[in-house]
């Protein structure tokens, strides 16, 4: 791990913790059981799939916990008052980009085979989260 990647990881973690806090402060009054199950499943699926994607890597355990931060943010987004199909689903897609990135480090052996899919899911997820946040501000006025 280089100093640059460690600093990037800290910035990543801080930004997602901050976003998770914002979502947690804006929880929907009532969520259905299915929404709760979806929110609970995202962190579990993220960690398990990351662990599997990193097989053969020397940092499997530590790095498989990395998406737990973004997945926790996604779970709070799913449960929040922000539009579910923009912010919640967008955050879940964003988490998928983290898992795809880790797959490139692990089972894909830095092949870059899923590079475009990784970046596309990152951009689409981020855009959906941003659009959900923007529409929430418009709806609240």
Residues covered by each model-derived region:
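Polytopic alpha-helical membrane-helix bundles and their juxtamembrane interface segments
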Residues: 1-141
